[in-house]
UniProtKB/Swiss-Prot annotation:
Residues bearing the modification Phosphoserine: S3, S35, S49, S102, S124, S131, S138
Family indicated by similarity: Belongs to the globin family.
Superkingdom per UniProt: Eukaryota
Protein function: Involved in oxygen transport from the lung to the various peripheral tissues.
A GO molecular-function descriptor: peroxidase activity
The protein, known as: Hemoglobin subunit alpha
Subunit: Heterotetramer of two alpha chains and two beta chains.
Tissue expression summary: Red blood cells.
Residues that, per the record, bind O2: H58
């Protein structure tokens, strides 16, 4: 459960992301594909090379979804219901991949906002991304 301090930290961190959410999403996806090559199996139709328009496009979707989640932190299940359905029933993504992408997102955010990435902000973002992952995998059960 996100505390009021966690919510404040997440909102402040996301404000600093600003218009870079899609770029950071794409960078996190690239990190994930390079660090965890098995994740590429869900994207057989994508050009996964650096700077690929398909990775950038999916990165924008990731960034937009996270922005929506930040805006609706008090109702993540409602905000992410359609996305949860898509990943559970149509795409059938292995739930562990959400944890891998979350880790890569944390690394990406830390690399771009090192001065602001305090231990408290890191912990809050980690809890937030874990909550998002839990919601996205809730329909697998």
């Amino acid at each position: 459960v996100l505390s009021p301090a966690d919510k404040t930290n997440v909102k402040a961190a996301w404000e600093k992301v600003g218009g870079h959410a899609g770029d950071y999403g794409a960078e996190a996806l690239e990190r994930m594909f390079l660090s965890f090559p098995t994740t590429k199996t869900y994207f057989p139709h994508f050009d996964l090379s650096h700077g690929s328009s398909q990775v950038k496009g999916h990165g924008k979707k990731v960034g937009d979804a996270l922005g929506n989640a930040v805006a609706h932190m008090d109702d993540l299940p409602g905000a992410l219901s359609a996305l949860s359905d898509l990943h559970a029933y149509k795409l059938r993504v292995d739930p562990v991949n959400f944890k891998l992408l979350s880790h890569c997102l944390l690394v990406t955010l830390a690399s771009h906002h090192a001065a602001d990435f305090t231990p408290a902000v890191h912990a809050s973002l980690d809890k937030f991304l874990a909550s998002v992952s839990t919601v996205l995998t809730s329909k697998y059960r």
